[in-house]
Amino acid sequence: MKKILILFILIFTSCENDYLDVVPDNIATIDLAFNTRTTAENFLSTCYTYIPEHAHAEQNFAMLAGDEVWYYAENDFYMNNETSFRVAKGMQNSSSPYLNYWEGGRGAPHSLFVALRDCNIFLENLVAVPGLEEEERLRWLDEVKVLKAFYHFWLMQMYGPIPIVKTNIPVGASASETNVYRSSIDDVVDYLTELLDEVIEADNLPGFINYIYTEKGRITMPIAKALKAKILMLSASPIFNGNSDFSSLVDNQGNSLVNQTYDPQKWVLAKEAVLEAIESAEANGHFLHQFNQQLPINGGVNDQVTQELSLRTAITEPFNSEIIWAFSADWTGELQQWCQPRWSADHSALFGYTKKSHAPTLNMVETFYTRNGVPIDEDTSWEYGNRFDVVQTPIFDTNNENYHEF
């Protein structure tokens, strides 16, 4: 019996294992994402989906992570914000960070390194797609290059020195290959500007969008040049240009990650990039928004009200001429609801829409300059000492016009 058992084991251990090395049918591969124009365009759309929602108070750290606005509570009947507002309250931490665009989570819907990986996959595989014209292929490639620069830039704004993701690390890479170093701010900026210069010189992007119902929000040449200008402006700013506060920020190879010597030439480069971006925008139909709609008011409105409406609708009117890059998937209605005050009890029917939560602090209000262009505590014609006095708003202004009419 023992001999039979040994023979049985030897027979089965000597069999070949090739029958296990079979890939099942109908398994999706990366090739399938680029085998038609439609599937390739879907992958292009995927590269866009990682764009953070700038108007989303919980996703954009610039919205509430400072003290420009403040909530009376982080949770109430109308809204909740337990991410960026907690950063403003000093609750940011390293173990489970808020607005974690590094890994995704805590207010950040995605890891932007995943976004960069998808961008690289697209750039590596959009080679010969059936049904895709060469002109369109080149445009798509440059769109994704700009997105790649944008995602790097967003990470740099949040974390300073970051790893540059030029190409994807293979899935089967060794542990040592996956341990990448963060690059210095100067190296990151150099790489991003080189990437954008490559796009600008190739001139494959449109100057403006013709098909507004299907392509609004897609990358254009003014967007690429504006992004380059923003990157160079941040590089030239005191944050990363000779900032001694970052003198101890070095990697384990002893390399300084933020340059410690102020370089005025960075402002020259930034100025040139800004001028080029402005010229490109103006040449492609972008200009300061002006309110020019007809209002059902006898005699119309005066210049002051028109100016106020121009400032207001520059924010609220979608895809107006002043906007260089508007992301069509972004939802701004909630932000406007949070900002909307409740003027009186007569508006009780609108209480579900006017949430009165997003408001500037008095500290921010006092930083505004007077009409003479100086801080309020330096303007001798402004009664700084009486700034907290309660005053009655007049029904009519100096032009004898009803203050509340509009």
Language model features with spans:
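A short linear-motif detector with a strong N-terminal bias
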Residues: 12-13, 30, 102, 143-144, ...
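Bacterial Sec-dependent N-terminal signal peptides
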Residues: 1-25
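Short edge-strand/loop segments of extracellular domains
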Residues: 168-173
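Conserved, well-structured interaction surfaces
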Residues: 38-59, 78-159, 175-216, 221
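A general lysine-centric signal
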Residues: 2-3, 148, 228
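An aromatic- and glycine-enriched ligand-binding surface/loop that stacks and positions planar moieties
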Residues: 16-83, 162, 166, 218-222, ...
